[in-house]
């Protein structure tokens, strides 16, 4: 596994109503991990390196800097996107997230499209 699966675990916990964590902090972290490519760090990769190219092409080209194992990484990103989309759909329909409903639904649809699109 070369992708980031913390977002899959958090999304699964949201969908299954697992107690014990702050949903607002979780949503903010899922938003950042799903839509912001991390800056380059010295000594290795962290987070979703290659996210911008994945978003652009629907896959991570093998020549993407800091994003080795491009096929595995592409599959991992798609799985994470779909998982997070399911969590956002669920939360969008709760009173606690009523003020963010439109944002969550828009991001959920964007993630689902990204996870299921055919490469260009």
Write out the residue ranges for each language-model feature.
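Aromatic-rich carbohydrate-recognition surfaces in CAZymes
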Residues: 1-92, 112
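Catalytic cores of carbohydrate-active enzymes
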Residues: 90-120
């Amino acid at each position: 596994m070369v992708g980031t699966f913390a977002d899959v675990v958090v999304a699964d916990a949201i969908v299954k109503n697992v107690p014990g964590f702050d949903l607002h902090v979780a949503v903010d972290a899922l938003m950042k991990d799903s839509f912001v490519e991390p800056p380059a760090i010295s000594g290795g990769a962290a987070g979703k390196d290659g996210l911008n190219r994945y978003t652009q092409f629907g896959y991570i080209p093998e020549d993407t800097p800091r994003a080795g194992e491009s096929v595995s990484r592409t599959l991992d990103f798609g799985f994470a996107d779909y998982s997070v989309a399911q969590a956002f759909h669920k939360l969008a329909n709760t009173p606690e997230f009523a003020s963010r409903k439109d944002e969550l639904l828009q991001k959920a649809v964007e993630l689902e499209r990204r996870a299921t699109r055919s490469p260009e």
